[in-house]
Amino acid sequence: MLFYLSKIFWFLIQPLNLAIFLLAFSMLVALFGWRKLGGLTALASFLILALSAWTSLGALMLNPLEERFPRPPPPDEVAGIIVLGGGFEGAINLARGGYDVNRGGDRFLEAAVLARRYPDAKIAVSGGTGTLVLNGEGDAVTAPKLFAALGVPASRLILETKSRNTYENVENLRQLVAPEPDETWLLVTSAFHMPRSVGLFRKAAFPVVAWPVDYRTSGKEGIGVMRDNPADSLQTTTMAIREWFGLIAYKFVGRIDSVVPGPDDASGLVGQDGAARGGEELPPDQNAQQQQGGQGEDQGPYEPPKVAD
């Protein structure tokens, strides 16, 4: 039920839709002679669009989330790489049979890079179809085609195709992967999406190492107008509002323990300070080895593995 309510609520309040609804309402009430109310709602509609498309509001809202989890030094050993869905054009791929990526496609490209760095690591992809009315191919269905093209064998993949949102991503993966206590799993998702994702994994007692990708801000936008293409600014604002609403809603229903989970909220993460599992400090020699990247060192020319039949 919460899934359907969240989709309906978001459809109503996302900036572009809300502006259209307010404009339609202003025209309707004006027809009944309530011109002052109609004028106020029309003004509200204009302000929503202007702030969303012509200012840096979206970047200012999104940047704190992107900066929450800096990328740590590469761990020496990795048991698996988790990739959360949201990187493919589902409707296009369903119609054309390809693997077209969207702005979140960095998730899967980075996963392929990590797959080369850690050749023994499993790659767990989670992503079904999370829309109410639009048809599309789930990311976990499309991902094997892209990975095969990039030289990642199908035998390394763990595919979770049923989840519709981040909460279901985590719950389904926890049951499917069943990680061992001493294993290290990298979590690859968009930087702005990392706080909510890590909060869910912590709640599920599934320790992960945050590996953020797909940054949408430079961190230098500042307060101003016309700092980006209006269409991109509108998309950034929409993304930021959606993520903040998601964080607040998940905290309200108890799915995460804080509104904006961070690296210092709990142990079980490998961070830039060299903290190991359980929050213990690594000895200086081990910490230096970790920061050198272990398996992340240069491995010479790339020789793609054979794709499994």
Language-model region placement:
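Hydrophobic alpha-helical segments of integral membrane proteins
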Residues: M1-F9, L57, M61-L65, I241-I248
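Membrane-embedded alpha-helical segments of integral membrane proteins
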Residues: M1-A30
